[in-house]
């Protein structure tokens, strides 16, 4: 499984697609450039995943495309292969592609220097990209494609206007590709404002809860008892790496301090931290220098760390779409994974709503949960 995709689960996936969508069984069948194929195989890919086999050809044809499938199914590589974005630089090693990450919280001068030099691919956060366009350091007249990764998040109220700002600067013929693990109906409706007759490749919702990932809840009578429950779990389980999700930055800081006071080793990350600090924390976690990371939903999307075997929702997500993104951090690359949800009486309705939305059942945590992580 060099490409990090659980092939057994992938093969069972059912899609709802536009009529013109066909399945390309191999990368060769997609008629990709020879140099790109070399990069794909050198990166460890052997054959396309279910979403890749349906979406790559459509994007390469220049069609506006909406691709939705659960975490860990190769969506990032779907558009990376199509436009040579950076899973990135690796796929373009044989093509001399210039890529730059243009993100908030980093040095503006570096962005200006790199963009003035010229880039084939720019990946970035909406605010910084819009800023670079307004400064005229990112020139848009030759842009051929706009990709919205994690589109449900980018098209929510927080980012929507920034995305529209970017889109208004682009040439009318710009191809638009929308990618996400979850695409609520209102987000799909929104795409009609800036996409032209898009091809749709959507996994059926009851497929979305990640086969092979065990989901449990622990009933906790009072909010203030969650901390003791977490400490008991921490003492009981032998984990490789774990992520604990809280709903607010303040809660992340509070829980981190409490855990450290109790002599537990943890790291933490949230959106108030400078980008450089987040990068450093992330690197430590990837290299397994830290085993437990406490975070807000800033960590819930698009981040692969192979050894994460446990996700704990200290707080259930306030947005049910975020549930699938959170638990998808565990059990990646076909490994065993467990998600444990702390549920107070006030949370029962939210838990039932999540079960209904994803057509899944979340059982009470068994006594032998440690065996499931072994």
Swiss-Prot record:
Domain Helicase ATP-binding: 56-201
Described function: ATP-dependent RNA helicase involved in 40S ribosomal subunit biogenesis. Required for the processing and cleavage of 35S pre-rRNA at sites A0, A1, and A2, leading to mature 18S rRNA.
Record's comment describing the protein's domains: The Q motif is unique to and characteristic of the DEAD box family of RNA helicases and controls ATP binding and hydrolysis.
Span(s) of short sequence motif DEAD box: 149-152
Family statement drawn from the similarity comment of this UniProt entry: Belongs to the DEAD box helicase family. DDX48/FAL1 subfamily.
Places the protein is found: Nucleus, Nucleolus
Helicase C-terminal domain boundaries: 212-373
UniProt keyword annotation of Transmembrane present: no
Protein name according to UniProt: ATP-dependent RNA helicase FAL1
């Amino acid at each position: 499984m060099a490409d990090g995709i659980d092939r057994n689960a992938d093969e069972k996936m059912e899609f709802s697609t536009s009529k013109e969508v066909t399945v390309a069984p191999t990368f060769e069948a997609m008629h990709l450039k020879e140099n790109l194929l070399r990069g794909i195989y050198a990166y460890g890919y052997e054959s396309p995943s279910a979403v890749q086999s349906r979406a790559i050809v459509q994007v390469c044809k220049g069609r506006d495309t909406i691709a939705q499938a659960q975490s860990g199914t190769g969506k990032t590589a779907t558009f990376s292969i199509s436009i040579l974005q950076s899973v990135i630089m690796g796929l373009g090693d044989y093509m001399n592609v210039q890529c730059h990450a243009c993100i908030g919280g980093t040095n503006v001068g570096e962005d200006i220097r790199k963009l003035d030099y010229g880039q084939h691919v720019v990946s970035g956060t909406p605010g910084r990209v819009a800023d670079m366009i307004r400064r005229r350091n990112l020139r848009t007249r030759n842009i051929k494609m706009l990709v919205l990764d994690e589109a449900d998040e980018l098209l929510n109220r927080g980012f929507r206007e920034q995305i529209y700002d970017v889109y208004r600067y682009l040439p009318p013929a710009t191809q638009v590709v929308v990618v996400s693990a979850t695409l609520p109906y209102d987000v799909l409706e929104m795409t009609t404002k800036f996409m032209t007759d898009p091809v749709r490749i959507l996994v059926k919702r009851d497929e979305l809860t990640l086969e092979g990932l065990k989901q449990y809840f622990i009933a906790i009578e009072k909010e203030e008892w969650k901390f003791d429950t977490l400490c008991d779990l921490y003492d009981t389980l032998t984990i490789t790496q774990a992520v604990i999700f809280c709903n607010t930055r303040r809660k992340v800081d509070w829980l981190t301090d409490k855990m450290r006071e109790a002599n537990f080793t943890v790291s933490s990350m949230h959106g108030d931290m400078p980008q450089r600090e987040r990068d450093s924390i992330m690197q430590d976690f990837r290299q397994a220098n830290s085993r437990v990371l406490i975070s807000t939903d800033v960590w819930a999307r698009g981040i692969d760390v192979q050894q994460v075997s446990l996700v704990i929702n200290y707080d259930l997500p306030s947005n049910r779409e975020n549930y699938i993104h959170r638990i998808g951090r565990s059990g990646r690359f076909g490994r065993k994974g467990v998600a444990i949800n702390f549920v107070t009486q006030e949370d029962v309705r939210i838990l039932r709503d999540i079960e209904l939305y994803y057509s899944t059942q979340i059982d009470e945590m068994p006594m032998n949960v440690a065996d499931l992580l072994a």
